[in-house]
């Protein structure tokens, strides 16, 4: 019986080391299952899987940012580890290029400088010939002024002012009125005839100005004070001293040769005061004084007729006192 008691224990003792040395059999009999350990939650953060955790997001970032604390360059195996795993989830963020010295900081300045140089170099090449040859060239700047004239340069004040010198003496009795339409020239001339005696005026054929010569400088200054005045509620008139020497010289020659033409016909038709130089035209018209005398001669009072007068006798006074007449 003792032999039978020892025999069954022997194989158990011999089989126990075989079970311990076998890598495929589980440790306890109750927990023996056919599922891997990581699916059952048996992963207590072992030490051996740390080298393989480079592909993890948290450990990978730690591996990449570790050179910042160490102050050295990142290890070379880290860079190809992310390129090989194309099907795996992303290991680093899109902003890691800026924070990582090995991957982002060092190439960024070089790439930015390259981009700036590439972007700016064609701009400089394009703008330099344009600004240097076409825009700021003295020859090109002077060409448009020679070929085309601006509206200000077509103004007679611009062309006449260039011909004046410091030695020229202008007649202060001449003024230039401008800013009115051609249809209102007679109306404007009539308005300026109120400021003084107009000896002569020269109307522009195509422009909107005319030169007026007054009898005295004081009258010309009075006309100059009307610069910017509005006539007829729709016409603003400008008045400036006349600077056209040709008009002044022609006027002086005309007065010396034929003084009767000193006053032009438009002024006579507007009813301005007549001058001695206009006597040939006035002689054909009946004077106003003669017309006045002819119209009032039939209505003069005749001295022979007796006009009724009030009776101032004593009887009439007594009757007026008594009866209240």
Swiss-Prot record:
<keyword id="KW-0653">Protein transport</keyword>
<feature type="modified residue" description="Phosphoserine">
    <location>
        <position position="73"/>
    </location>
</feature>
<dbReference type="GO" id="GO:0044615">
    <property type="term" value="C:nuclear pore nuclear basket"/>
</dbReference>
<dbReference type="GO" id="GO:0005635">
    <property type="term" value="C:nuclear envelope"/>
</dbReference>
<dbReference type="GO" id="GO:0006999">
    <property type="term" value="P:nuclear pore organization"/>
</dbReference>
<feature type="modified residue" description="Phosphoserine">
    <location>
        <position position="121"/>
    </location>
</feature>
<feature type="domain" description="RRM Nup35-type">
    <location>
        <begin position="169"/>
        <end position="249"/>
    </location>
</feature>
<feature type="modified residue" description="Phosphothreonine">
    <location>
        <position position="279"/>
    </location>
</feature>
<comment type="subunit">
    <text>Interacts with TMEM48/NDC1. Forms a complex with NUP93, NUP155, NUP205 and lamin B. The interaction with NUP93 is direct.</text>
</comment>
<dbReference type="GO" id="GO:0006607">
    <property type="term" value="P:NLS-bearing protein import into nucleus"/>
</dbReference>
<feature type="modified residue" description="Phosphoserine">
    <location>
        <position position="66"/>
    </location>
</feature>
<feature type="region of interest" description="Disordered">
    <location>
        <begin position="69"/>
        <end position="94"/>
    </location>
</feature>
<feature type="modified residue" description="Phosphothreonine">
    <location>
        <position position="106"/>
    </location>
</feature>
<protein>
    <recommendedName>
        <fullName>Nucleoporin NUP35</fullName>
    </recommendedName>
</protein>
<keyword id="KW-0472">Membrane</keyword>
<feature type="modified residue" description="Phosphoserine">
    <location>
        <position position="137"/>
    </location>
</feature>
<feature type="modified residue" description="Phosphothreonine">
    <location>
        <position position="264"/>
    </location>
</feature>
<feature type="modified residue" description="Phosphoserine">
    <location>
        <position position="283"/>
    </location>
</feature>
<feature type="modified residue" description="Phosphoserine">
    <location>
        <position position="99"/>
    </location>
</feature>
<keyword id="KW-0811">Translocation</keyword>
<dbReference type="GO" id="GO:0042802">
    <property type="term" value="F:identical protein binding"/>
</dbReference>
<keyword id="KW-0539">Nucleus</keyword>
<dbReference type="GO" id="GO:1990830">
    <property type="term" value="P:cellular response to leukemia inhibitory factor"/>
</dbReference>
<feature type="modified residue" description="Phosphothreonine">
    <location>
        <position position="274"/>
    </location>
</feature>
<feature type="modified residue" description="Phosphoserine">
    <location>
        <position position="53"/>
    </location>
</feature>
<dbReference type="GO" id="GO:0005543">
    <property type="term" value="F:phospholipid binding"/>
</dbReference>
<dbReference type="GO" id="GO:0051028">
    <property type="term" value="P:mRNA transport"/>
</dbReference>
<dbReference type="GO" id="GO:0005652">
    <property type="term" value="C:nuclear lamina"/>
</dbReference>
<feature type="modified residue" description="Phosphothreonine">
    <location>
        <position position="307"/>
    </location>
</feature>
<feature type="modified residue" description="Phosphoserine">
    <location>
        <position position="251"/>
    </location>
</feature>
<dbReference type="GO" id="GO:0017056">
    <property type="term" value="F:structural constituent of nuclear pore"/>
</dbReference>
<dbReference type="GO" id="GO:0044613">
    <property type="term" value="C:nuclear pore central transport channel"/>
</dbReference>
<keyword id="KW-0813">Transport</keyword>
<keyword id="KW-0906">Nuclear pore complex</keyword>
<keyword id="KW-0509">mRNA transport</keyword>
<dbReference type="InterPro" id="IPR007846">
    <property type="entry name" value="RRM_NUP35_dom"/>
</dbReference>
<comment type="similarity">
    <text>Belongs to the Nup35 family.</text>
</comment>
<feature type="modified residue" description="Phosphoserine">
    <location>
        <position position="100"/>
    </location>
</feature>
<feature type="region of interest" description="Disordered">
    <location>
        <begin position="1"/>
        <end position="37"/>
    </location>
</feature>
<feature type="modified residue" description="Phosphoserine">
    <location>
        <position position="55"/>
    </location>
</feature>
<dbReference type="InterPro" id="IPR035979">
    <property type="entry name" value="RBD_domain_sf"/>
</dbReference>
<feature type="modified residue" description="Phosphoserine">
    <location>
        <position position="278"/>
    </location>
</feature>
